[in-house]
Amino acid sequence: MSLTTRSSCPACKDSRIKEIFSLPYNSREMIEFLSSYYKGTIDIKKLYEQHYKLLECGNCNLIFQEQIPNKKFSQELYEKYIDKDDSLKKKDDYEKKYHKKLFYEMSLIKKIFKKKNEEISILDFGAGWGFWLNYFKKNNFDVYAFEVSETRIDFLKKNKIKIIPDIINTDNKFDFIYSEETFEHISDPKETLINLSKILKENGFIMLRFPSSFLFKLRLNDGYKPCTDCAHPLEHINLLKKKSFENMIIDSNLEIINFKSKFNFSLRNFLKDIKNIFYFDSVLIKKINK
């Protein structure tokens, strides 16, 4: 259970960062949270000499955890310490619970590409149990998954979903790459975004969803306690901002689409875009010719 330290912004690589919150891992609040959330599976004493620190980038305003799990510990969190049964149970009646969201996303994709479903290739990066992809598979899209958890990969394979084992060494190219509640977990969001763009077809799109950090800084006072919010200790290591994405794509062949409703216009969709300007929990990015 080792932590590694980030000394510069993972979004823009700027070193002008400041500490905005700190809490020892051996504090009562942190021990109570980690013990409860991970159901006693983590040996918290191994973290006692470390601090949960939130830093803010002076350039792109990204808030991020300074000390984060190394690759081995991160894999253990996802595969060993997070209760798999609870994780899977949360997906009960997935399509019924999220019907409106799924229909909106499918309509958006169809409007963007204007071709038959089976001709549209989709990659879900960080696919988890694959319920999002399964909805699109049922609607005849050409779907693929990238996932790091062996348990979840086995589940995906049982549901006949094609797996991409590596986003670096693959010949596959995709029309649309989707990722939900993944980018807040990864240590290198900029590098990951650029690597995803390399397996995107020309004029393809990347859509990312993540927890909103709207007004989060107002909660950072002496009474703040760690919880499963946008700054979840050890897990939500990046609190993503639009300015952060703008910096990530500098000198790339990517551009941010501010209004998704331009492809699928309705008053409801337009108002969603207005809300997202402030709340910001999703971003649509297009690959352009340069």
PLM regions and their residue ranges:
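Surface-exposed loop/turn positions
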Residues: 120, 203-204
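Conserved N-terminal segment of class I S-adenosyl-L-methionine
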Residues: 1-180, 190-193, 261-264, 270-283, ...
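S-adenosyl-L-methionine-dependent methyltransferase catalytic module, highlighting the catalytic core
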Residues: 3-6, 155, 187-195, 205-290
